[in-house]
Regions:
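Helix-to-loop junctions at the C-terminal end of transmembrane segments
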Residues: 72-84, 276-287, 373-374, 477-478
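Extracytoplasmic gate region of multi-pass secondary transporters
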Residues: 40-44, 223-276, 365, 440-456
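C-terminal transmembrane helical hairpin of 12-TM major facilitator-type secondary transporters
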Residues: 268, 286-337
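Helix-loop-helix hairpin linking two adjacent transmembrane segments in secondary transporters
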Residues: 152-200, 378
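Hydrophobic core of transmembrane alpha-helices in multi-pass small-molecule transporters
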Residues: 31, 99, 111-127, 234, ...
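Cytoplasmic helix-loop-helix junction between adjacent transmembrane helices
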Residues: 116-154
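Conserved MFS/SLC helix-loop-helix module at the cytosolic interface between two early adjacent transmembrane helices
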Residues: 71-109
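Residue-level signature of mid-helix packing/kink "hotspots" within the transmembrane helices
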Residues: 38, 66-74, 160-161, 269-277, ...
């Protein structure tokens, strides 16, 4: 094999890792980190019942986790770009372990929010996709990068497939507090395996901007396709966290057992292994943006099915299989597009901002769904919202350009960052139409809310207000 990193400086203290070691290290870290993260859904019932807190309170803790995770990822990515990924991954693992241990000692909703929310969120910022995929992308050459990213992502689904039912069994046998020891042990193992990811390429890719992370960010936020990619990945975050956290409860509300609910999450993980690997292969042969549009469209259809088709154990597993095929398949494609656009030198910080957008969507997907169910006793409206966002995501990706920014006829000019991303997006004429459309969709959804609830219900007026408050970008109108 030609080792990926022929431009690396090889010394007695640092040798170039073979491809298998890179993928195994990245894959194991991803499997454990994402696998443990995927078990949060099976903890919802036992924690809320034991502590006497609401679904919304638990959803808020996980929403905080996603927000802290997202906010920390650009920082973790920038540190990894400069000092190497392994140190960041180990630091993330330490926070992750401490967060789970603190959760085991928590007795209030505030304790859960601090432990599973803030501390675990910091751990995930260091030990998650943004850092791992950036490292793998740097160490693997472009010809096999899509497959390598897909393989690493697929390990995350493998972790979900194995750990969700295993954790459910541990909860049933020992209780939710003691079951956290399983995640702590596996995280310690993952931390010890990340050293093959310590090497950093010293080459200067043609697409890398000179002047460090701030310079590349000025260019990235001036590139419309990168900004659209951020918005698209917001939809992914909304979908994944809403389903990962609330699918078990939704199925139990529909009359399914906790075993079926846990098996449904595991089925998503199992089928995503094949789906992600297939997407990695397709990503090397077709435009990634078109594949992403297809994935979001399939999600939308699957979400509609969850509402309109009567639930049964068989349908629960069948729909989970369909969702699983497109579950994390968006991650390697989105990551590959960023690498195509800007090269590998600043992948960590650029991935970090993409995943920050993902986690903002995750915050709304987890917290909003919990509030919605507490208020109305059903998740139906949220499934429809997820479907609408899937359609929007599919359309959005048709307008994203994969070309390296420096190959464009009119390369993006560096933008000043002091006015913030929102101002940059708002100043774009096309975005005005997008915002107007969003407000229109949410207004229609509010009207739909009145029609879906019995006219005599006192909740009818509140439902539309809650939807608008959660999803209009500037809060409720009026």
């Amino acid at each position: 094999h030609r080792c990926y990193g022929e431009h690396l400086s090889v010394t007695s203290n640092e040798r170039i890792s073979p491809v298998a070691a890179i993928l195994l290290a990245g894959g194991l870290a991803t499997a454990v980190s994402m696998g443990v993260r995927s078990t949060m859904g099976v903890y919802l019932d036992p924690i809320t019942v034991d502590l006497g807190i609401s679904t919304g309170a638990f959803g808020f803790a996980i929403a905080i986790q996603n927000l802290v995770w997202g906010l920390g990822q650009p920082i973790a990515g920038a540190v990894a770009d400069r000092y190497g990924s392994a140190r960041v991954l180990v630091a993330g693992g330490v926070f992750y372990i401490f967060g789970l241990a603190a959760a085991g000692a928590a007795n209030t909703s505030a304790g859960i929010s601090i432990s599973l929310g803030v501390i675990t969120g910091l751990g995930l910022a260091g030990l998650s996709f943004a850092v791992i995929l950036a490292s793998v992308g740097r160490l693997v050459d472009e010809s096999r990068r899509a497959t390598a990213l897909a393989t690493t992502t697929a390990f995350g689904s493998l972790g979900q497939f194995v750990l969700v039912p295993l954790t459910q069994s541990a909860i049933d046998a020992f209780g939710w507090r003691q079951s956290l020891i399983l995640g702590i042990t596996l995280l310690a193992l993952a931390m010890s395996s990340v050293w093959p990811l310590r090497s950093r390429s010293e080459q200067s890719a043609p697409s890398a901007a000179k002047g460090g992370g701030r310079a590349i960010l000025r260019i990235a936020f001036g590139y419309r396709s990168y900004v659209l990619l951020l918005i698209g990945f917001f939809v992914c975050g909304f979908h994944v966290t809403f389903i990962g956290l609330h699918l078990p409860k939704y199925l139990e509300d529909a009359g399914q057992t906790s075993k079926i609910a846990a098996l449904a999450l595991a089925t998503i993980g199992l089928f995503n292994i094949g789906g992600t690997m297939a997407i990695g292969w397709l990503g090397g042969r077709f435009k990634n943006t078109r594949l992403l549009a297809l994935l979001y469209g399939i999600r939308a259809v699957a979400f509609v099915g969850m509402v309109v088709i009567p639930m049964s154990p068989e349908f629960a597993l069948l729909s989970s299989a369909v969702i699983g095929v497109v579950w994390l398949s968006t991650v390697p494609l989105t990551s590959a597009i960023v690498l195509k656009q800007f090269g590998p030198d600043h992948a960590g910080i650029l991935f970090g901002f993409v995943f920050l957008s993902h986690q903002i969507g995750a915050f709304i997907g987890s917290y909003g769904a919990g509030i919605y169910r507490d208020a109305y006793g059903s998740y139906s409206g949220y499934w429809w919202l997820a479907a609408l966002l899937g359609v929007a995501g599919a359309i959005l990706h048709l307008f994203i350009d994969e070309e390296p920014y420096h190959n464009l006829k009119n390369p993006p000019r560096p933008r000043e960052l002091n006015t913030g991303l929102l101002a940059k997006i708002w100043n774009r004429r096309k975005a005005v139409g997008a915002v107007t459309s969003t407000i229109g969709v949410m207004a229609l959804l509010g009207v739909w809310s009145y029609l879906r609830i019995d006219a005599n219900s006192e909740l009818a007026g509140q439902q539309a207000a809650v939807i608008c408050a959660l999803h209009l970008p500037f809060g409720p109108l009026g």
